């Protein structure tokens, strides 16, 4: 038997990090078992579903590094992979009628004026009432007894059927409800394992009843604890941004996000920083924690920073350029060798691509702004002009433009005792970058190059505020 798993988002907004983690766990198990991973779009909510959201979700999944073997964009043997298209083909209607014929479901006719008022239930199709414009739904008859199933994470579960009560499976507009459509789709797409958030746990007995009524084999279920905010309630917009799109925009690497999401409930020994794809063989569904986990943006940034320093510098440059394009920022135009030097020294002090962009900006562009503290504490002093004048002279005479060479000039300027060494170094640092926190001063000067450094000193000397 081929193991088959799926991720089935509703296209009503951006991909939530909780959804991304669910997709990741499904993907990990499918790949580990040499099975198939299916993407299905559950777009039966006509008022909220949009093509724009579907496109955004697919783009976010691809960016996360999650690929699929079948889906709405690539097709497959068990399509269509959009529920709205499956409605058009009459798939759900066909199985709803089978349930009615077996008297496992029934039609409900509603009053034309008070559309919530039930007139009667029947196993016979009320064609006459349909012609008169009455709303008609199909509801599932919940049998007596207890519904039991084994959850891979939570163990043996049971629900009293009497507490659940009959439920609608086809709405008056002809569209299936979630609990009905998901059973039909999972069965016809031959899904063997259903991994999803524990907020779906209460839906499971309803779905199992439908499986049994149709005489179908039931897949294995696993319900994953939800990601929580710091107040231990399910992570939502009130806790701040929660979409994959947001974290991509602020400069989180896909490998950093996937690593962190994997840590939310799954562990690989003592390791906290790893490439998720390299840990496929270690993934065991039963090893996922059965407790809710808190989403910590600071820990995410920490993990991401580790990845930024782990990957080779060429890969970081490629990620950096793609992120700049994605966020529509100004692209550096320089030799790649120069860019690699800049990123190599700057990545040590940052944890996101956004921070890297801001931190490295003055290496790539001349229109950087001067920090207020630099201006007030160093540039607007009585000694600033004298040091900058002497810096222009000494750096112009420097033949050995290297880390060692620039260090000698900086120390020579400090030895003149015009100001303390710290004040001299901070003035020079701010003069060429606009910042008081940068990579090492001598390394910064060496990378920027003689021409750019002298031009920046001269520009400040000619400024009004200096």
Curated annotation (Swiss-Prot):
Catalytic activity annotation: tRNA(Glu) + L-glutamate + ATP = L-glutamyl-tRNA(Glu) + AMP + diphosphate
Chain location of the short sequence motif 'HIGH' region per the record: 9-19
InterPro entries: aa-tRNA-synth_I_cd-bd, aa-tRNA-synth_I_codon-bd_sub2, aa-tRNA-synth_I_CS, aa_tRNA-synth_I_cd-bd_sf, Glu-tRNA-ligase_bac/mito, Glu-tRNA-synth_I_codon-bd_sub1, Glu/Gln-tRNA-synth, Glu/Gln-tRNA-synth_Ib_cat-dom
One cellular component (GO) term of this entry: cytosol
Ranges in a coiled coil: none
Annotated PROSITE patterns: AA_TRNA_LIGASE_I
Enzyme Commission (EC) number: 6.1.1.17
The keyword Transmembrane helix appears for this protein: no
Keywords, comma-separated and alphabetical: Aminoacyl-tRNA synthetase, ATP-binding, Cytoplasm, Ligase, Nucleotide-binding, Protein biosynthesis
Compartments where located: Cytoplasm
Keyword ATP-binding: yes
A Gene Ontology BP annotation from the UniProt entry: glutamyl-tRNA aminoacylation
Record-listed ATP binding positions: 237
Pfam families: Anticodon_2, tRNA-synt_1c
Description of how the protein assembles with itself and partners: Monomer.
Protein purpose: Catalyzes the attachment of glutamate to tRNA(Glu) in a two-step reaction: glutamate is first activated by ATP to form Glu-AMP and then transferred to the acceptor end of tRNA(Glu).
Family: Belongs to the class-I aminoacyl-tRNA synthetase family. Glutamate--tRNA ligase type 1 subfamily.
Protein name per UniProt: Glutamate--tRNA ligase 2
């Amino acid at each position: 038997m081929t193991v088959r798993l799926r991720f089935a988002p509703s296209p009503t907004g951006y991909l939530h990090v909780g959804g991304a983690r669910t997709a990741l766990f499904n993907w990990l198990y499918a790949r580990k078992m040499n099975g198939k991973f299916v993407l299905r779009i559950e777009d039966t909510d006509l008022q909220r579903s949009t093509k724009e959201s579907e496109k955004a979700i697919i783009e976010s999944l691809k960016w996360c590094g999650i690929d699929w073997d079948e889906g709405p964009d690539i097709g497959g043997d068990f399509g269509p992979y959009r529920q709205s298209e499956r409605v058009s083909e009459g798939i759900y209607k066909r199985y709803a009628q089978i349930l009615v014929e077996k008297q496992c479901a029934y039609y409900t006719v509603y009053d034309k004026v008070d559309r919530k008022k039930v007139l009667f239930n029947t196993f016979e199709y009320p064609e006459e009432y349909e012609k008169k414009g009455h709303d008609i739904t199909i509801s599932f008859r919940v049998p007596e007894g207890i519904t039991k199933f084994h959850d891979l994470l939570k163990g043996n579960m049971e629900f009293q059927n009497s507490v659940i009560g009959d439920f609608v499976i086809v709405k008056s507009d002809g569209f299936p409800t979630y609990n009905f459509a998901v059973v039909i789709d999972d069965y016809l797409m031959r899904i063997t394992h259903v991994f999803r958030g524990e907020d779906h746990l209460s839906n499971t007995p309803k779905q199992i009843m439908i499986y049994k009524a149709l005489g179908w084999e039931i897949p294995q279920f696993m319900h994953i604890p939800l990601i929580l905010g710091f107040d231990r309630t399910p992570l939502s917009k009130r806790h701040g941004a929660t979409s994959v799109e947001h974290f991509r925009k602020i400069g989180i690497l896909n490998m950093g996000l996937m690593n962190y999401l994997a840590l939310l409930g799954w562990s690989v020994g003592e390791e906290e920083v790893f490439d998720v794809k390299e840990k496929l063989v270690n993934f065991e569904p039963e090893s996922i924690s059965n407790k809710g986990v808190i989403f910590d943006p600071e820990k995410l940034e920490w993990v991401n920073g580790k990845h930024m320093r782990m990957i080779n510098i060429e890969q970081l440059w490629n990620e950096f350029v793609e992120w700049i394009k994605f966020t529509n920022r100004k692209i550096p135009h320089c030799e790649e060798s120069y860019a690699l030097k800049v990123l190599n020294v700057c990545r040590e002090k940052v944890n996101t691509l956004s921070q890297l962009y801001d931190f490295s900006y003055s290496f790539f562009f001349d229109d950087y702004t001067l920090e207020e503290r630099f201006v007030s504490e160093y540039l607007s002093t009585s000694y600033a002009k004298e040091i900058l004048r002497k810096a222009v002279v000494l750096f112009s005479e420097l033949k050995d433009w290297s880390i060692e060479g620039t260090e000698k000039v900086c120390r020579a300027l400090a030895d003149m005792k015009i100001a303390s060494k710290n004040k001299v170094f901070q003035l020079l640092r701010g003069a060429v970058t606009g910042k008081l926190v940068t990579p090492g001063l001598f390394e910064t000067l060496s990378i920027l190059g003689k021409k750019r450094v002298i031009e920046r000193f001269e520009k400040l000397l000619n400024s009004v505020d200096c």
